Amino acid sequence: MEPEPEPAAVEVPAGRVLSARELFAARSRSQKLPQRSHGPKDFLPDGSAAQAERLRRCREELWQLLAEQRVERLGSLVAAEWRPEEGFVELKSPAGKFWQTMGFSEQGRQRLHPEEALYLLECGSIHLFHQDLPLSIQEAYQLLLTDHTVTFLQYQVFSHLKRLGYVVRRFQPSSVLSPYERQLNLDASVQHLEDGDGKRKRSSSSPRSINKKAKALDNSLQPKSLAASSPPPCSQPSQCPEEKPQESSPMKGPGGPFQLLGSLGPSPGPAREGVGCSWESGRAENGVTGAGKRRWNFEQISFPNMASDSRHTLLRAPAPELLPANVAGRETDAESWCQKLNQRKEKLSRREREHHAEAAQFQEDVNADPEVQRCSSWREYKELLQRRQVQRSQRRAPHLWGQPVTPLLSPGQASSPAVVLQHISVLQTTHLPDGGARLLEKSGGLEIIFDVYQADAVATFRKNNPGKPYARMCISGFDEPVPDLCSLKRLSYQSGDVPLIFALVDHGDISFYSFRDFTLPQDVGH
């Protein structure tokens, strides 16, 4: 069976409108790609006619494919102009669907990066001009791909990812958080004050309104504090507040030492006097006794007990001085709530009980220490720890710790084999981003080129707020040197918590590599 005759080749100059005959010939030509492989590759030329014929046929198919010209509908093309002095492509007509994930606006004009324009030109979406002359794909490759714009390797990776459906944007160094922002755990994507509609978010309460509320609260409390400073005489002690609300500390009363301000209710009579705290005697100078340190006695301060075995379930109303002006306190009986508490003991297996029993042997209750109980503040507790540390250092044997060469560990530090290995290990665990902040000033070598977003995010992708990338891409050629450790640390620090991927291009074949952290296992049982 004879093969069908192929239509005559029609050479059409770029940008010219086709006639009916030329359009029919261009549309009726074969749309199949040439065969990529013609059998196994020969190791050496043998000079045979069959081998020469296979080579000739492969070359003809390749040149025929390269010489084939694209025919597109003129009305569906977006006119664009290449501006080499500015390094971008400016659109002359409204953009199409590609504008959702590609391009940027500047000075009220729609513009494309060179790699985006070249990709759209290959896809048949734009009509590119330069100096009012249409450009072919070959001419666009020569003009748009330079060392000052985008290299050929970078465009190969860009077009490869775009054909796979990913959203590819240029990497913005300004999106890298500073060391101070990373220390505060600030995320760049959270710093934007725009919501889904592009409008600025309104906070629930502005600082001005907060200041007004605080000022109104101070004004409402000020008359009460003045009135409480000079209480009127009364016959019933239960109706007279025994505390002064303008001070947070307990104040001295006429009949006894002090009473806790934060008690749940006013206690009538002197039966509650002297309950709460005691004062140490201060120094007396010129007949005036100085204020001593307060010592709270928490055994005598009644806190609400909500346990089911509690016999006192009636909670008194709080003092009116502790409540806002428009809030009234009342007594509450918590008996019904105490009966609803779940008092079932946790059921543990035998292995869990043994594990808890073994762990309890090495646990010490800090609150059971008498010296700790005598501490009334964090400052005294820290001073106690410091004194104990000095005492332990003085007990060390001088023939071991008084020499230039000392032991690696003290007996108190050897709590487990894992702790001993951690202290005596020479190689410490490290990560690639560690120490990368001081390497940011060093330039040269590999750089992050593209931010890659997943293909399923195209429908919801927004260029003004793209969010966190799926990966960041570094591009290198097969004949280029392998990146050193400084470059890897610098790039990993720039990438942050976004995975860093290296694209290696070998004559059109693209491979992707990445570095992952791993932890070596430690045998702490021997």
UniProtKB/Swiss-Prot annotation:
Kindly list the residue ranges recorded as spanning the membrane: none
Query: Compositional bias (Low complexity) at which positions?
Result: 220-229
Q: What is its main location?
A: nucleus
Where Phosphoserine occurs, the residues are 178, 267
Q: Which residues carry this modification: Phosphotyrosine?
A: 180
Output the PANTHER family linked to this UniProt entry.
Answer: TRNA-SPLICING ENDONUCLEASE SUBUNIT SEN54 (PTHR21027:SF1)
Disordered, as annotated region: 27-47, 192-290
Could you state one GO cellular component term attached to this entry? Answer: tRNA-intron endonuclease complex
Claim: Nucleus is one of the keywords in the record: yes
Q: Which family does it belong to?
A: Belongs to the SEN54 family.
Disease entry from the Swiss-Prot or TrEMBL record = Pontocerebellar hypoplasia 4: A disorder characterized by an abnormally small cerebellum and brainstem, severe neonatal encephalopathy, microcephaly, myoclonus and muscular hypertonia. There is a severe inferior olivary and pontine neuronal loss and a diffuse white matter gliosis.
Kindly list the positions at which N-acetylmethionine occurs in this protein: 1
Keyword vocabulary terms for this entry = Acetylation, Disease variant, Methylation, mRNA processing, Neurodegeneration, Nucleus, Phosphoprotein, Pontocerebellar hypoplasia, tRNA processing
User: Which superkingdom does the taxonomy of this entry point to?
Assistant: Eukaryota
UniProt name for this protein: tRNA-splicing endonuclease subunit Sen54
The role this protein plays is:
Non-catalytic subunit of the tRNA-splicing endonuclease complex, a complex responsible for identification and cleavage of the splice sites in pre-tRNA. It cleaves pre-tRNA at the 5' and 3' splice sites to release the intron. The products are an intron and two tRNA half-molecules bearing 2',3' cyclic phosphate and 5'-OH termini. There are no conserved sequences at the splice sites, but the intron is invariably located at the same site in the gene, placing the splice sites an invariant distance from the constant structural features of the tRNA body.
- List where in the cell it is found: Nucleus; Nucleus, Nucleolus
Assembly and oligomerization: tRNA splicing endonuclease is a heterotetramer composed of TSEN2, TSEN15, TSEN34/LENG5 and TSEN54. tRNA splicing endonuclease complex also contains proteins of the pre-mRNA 3'-end processing machinery such as CLP1, CPSF1, CPSF4 and CSTF2. Also belongs to a complex containing isoform 2 of SEN2.
Q: Name one GO biological process term.
A: tRNA splicing, via endonucleolytic cleavage and ligation
Q: Which residues carry this modification: Omega-N-methylarginine?
A: 316
Annotated organism of origin:
Homo sapiens (Human)
